[in-house]
Amino acid sequence: MEGSSKGLRKGAWTAEEDSLLRQCIGKYGEGKWHQVPLRAGLNRCRKSCRLRWLNYLKPSIKRGKFSSDEVDLLLRLHKLLGNRWSLIAGRLPGRTANDVKNYWNTHLSKKHEPCCKTKIKRINIITPPNTPAQKVDIF
């Protein structure tokens, strides 16, 4: 079982590990992640290899600041989809779900959260005697 494996490296990746992973993916392609650590000669678990590739090393990943068009699209998609980062990232070419989530949390969440959530207030309606009180949601 992978979780009980001892001696697997954790923490920051080295440039050498990144290079080994790139070479392995270049030779064998993406997928079959359970074989990647052995093929690449890495002392990492398969999940760590997969996430490192998908979130940092994959050549199609965009680096740098989000453009104003990307920010605008992110705002509209978040209003529509909520915190479904994978779905949102799928509509922002070159951006990973992790990038999108981190950008939202560091740049946009505090500015745009109030407009995206409808506050519900519960109030008691005054009713005639001998009838149960009613609770109504007010938006």
UniProtKB/Swiss-Prot annotation:
InterPro entries listed in its UniProt record: Homeodomain-like_sf, Myb_dom, Myb_TF_plants, SANT/Myb
What Gene3D superfamilies has UniProt attached to this entry? Homeodomain-like (1.10.10.60)
- Which terms in the GO cellular component ontology are assigned? nucleus
Please provide the record's keywords in A-Z order: Activator, Developmental protein, DNA-binding, Nucleus, Repeat, Transcription, Transcription regulation
Transmembrane stretches, start-end: none
Q: Which SUPFAM superfamilies match?
A: Homeodomain-like
- Tell me where in or outside the cell this protein is found: Nucleus
Q: Tell me one GO biological process term.
A: regulation of anthocyanin biosynthetic process
- Spell out the molecular function terms from Gene Ontology: DNA binding; DNA-binding transcription factor activity
Its chief place of residence is nucleus
Segments forming domain HTH myb-type:
5-61, 62-112
- Identify the DNA-binding region of this protein by residue numbers: 33-57, 85-108
- What does the record note on quaternary structure? Interacts with BHLH002/EGL3/MYC146, BHLH012/MYC1 and BHLH042/TT8.
According to its UniProt entry, the function of this protein is described as: Transcription activator, when associated with BHLH002/EGL3/MYC146, BHLH012/MYC1, or BHLH042/TT8.
Kindly provide the name given to this protein in its UniProt entry.
Answer: Transcription factor MYB114
Q: Which organism is it from?
A: Arabidopsis thaliana (Mouse-ear cress)
Source gene?
Answer: MYB114
